[in-house]
């Protein structure tokens, strides 16, 4: 009994004309999408608009899963062994970095208890206690000094508005910046009043240690930290 094997069908490949035609049909839509993403990434800062910043974080958060899916797709439909090898390496690197992101974010969440720990842009979280309310916001760089400003009751930290109804007397003696591996404590070194309801304070980095913020902290206990 004889068996017949069917020859594999030809692999379809785009021609240059088809690629040009595809770009002509989708160029406008792709341009709008890329322009939108560029504007969000360019102007998405907490000091400008919290809504735009959150959208920026969502876009950055979706980048790694999208890259992993594309790398896996390249592994399945590799053009040759060279492309397959590079695709496997890129997939492994993407998955490892994605896992490292979650590990670091969970460690930072344990230290601060804030969902800002899952911010994909930075692992620096500034924490300040104002009248029993702890405000947590991400900061991009590792600053040696931090500036708190009160303008007619409006409270700003590093240029980011955090709340209203505060005075200079409400500013704490210490501010902390949480990182994955340690917690930096900043001590208030300078306080200046511009008028009766406005002024600013400068905090200088004074201590670094392996601490976490307590979940419940009594009023005025600015230096109470829990070692981990």
Swiss-Prot record:
Keywords linked to the UniProt accession = Glycoprotein, Host Golgi apparatus, Host membrane, Host-virus interaction, Membrane, Transmembrane, Transmembrane helix, Viral envelope protein, Viral immunoevasion, Viral matrix protein, Virion
User: Which domain of life does the protein's organism represent?
Assistant: Viruses
Topology check: give the Virion surface ranges.
2-25, 78-85
**Which GO MF terms are attached to this record?**
structural constituent of virion
Pfam families from the entry?
A: CoV_M
* Segments in the Intravirion topological domain: 47-56, 107-228
Tell me where in or outside the cell this protein is found.
Answer: Virion membrane; Host Golgi apparatus membrane
Q: How does it sit in the membrane?
A: Multi-pass membrane protein
PROSITE patterns, per database record:
COV_M
Q: Transmembrane residues, as ranges? A: 26-46, 57-77, 86-106
Assembly description: Homomultimer. Interacts with envelope E protein in the budding compartment of the host cell, which is located between endoplasmic reticulum and the Golgi complex. Forms a complex with HE and S proteins. Interacts with nucleocapsid N protein. This interaction probably participates in RNA packaging into the virus.
Entry function:
Component of the viral envelope that plays a central role in virus morphogenesis and assembly via its interactions with other viral proteins.
- What name is this protein filed under? Membrane protein
**Native source species:** Murine coronavirus (strain JHM)
Upper lineage: Viruses, Riboviria, Orthornavirae, Pisuviricota, Pisoniviricetes
């Amino acid at each position: 009994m004889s068996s017949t094997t069917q020859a594999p069908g030809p692999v379809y490949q785009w021609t240059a004309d088809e690629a040009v035609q595809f770009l002509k049909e989708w160029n406008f839509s792709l341009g709008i999408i890329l322009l939108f993403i560029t504007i969000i990434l360019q102007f998405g800062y907490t000091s400008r608009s919290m809504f735009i910043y959150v959208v920026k974080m969502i876009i950055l958060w979706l980048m790694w899963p999208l890259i992993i899916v594309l790398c896996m797709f390249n592994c399945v439909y590799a053009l040759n062994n060279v492309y397959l090898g590079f695709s496997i390496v890129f997939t492994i690197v993407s998955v490892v970095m994605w896992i490292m992101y979650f590990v670091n974010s969970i460690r930072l969440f344990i230290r601060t208890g804030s969902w800002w720990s899952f911010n994909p842009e930075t692992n620096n979280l500034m924490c300040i206690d104002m009248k029993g309310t702890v405000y947590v916001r991400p900061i991009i760089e590792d600053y040696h000094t931090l500036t708190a400003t009160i303008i007619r009751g409006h409270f700003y930290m590093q240029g980011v508005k955090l709340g209203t109804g505060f005075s200079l007397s409400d500013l704490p003696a210490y501010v902390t910046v949480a990182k994955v591996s340690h917690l930096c404590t900043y001590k208030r070194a300078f306080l200046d009043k511009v008028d009766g309801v406005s002024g600013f304070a400068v905090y200088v980095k004074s201590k670094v240690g392996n601490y976490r913020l307590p979940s419940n902290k009594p009023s005025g206990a600015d230096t109470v930290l829990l070692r981990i």
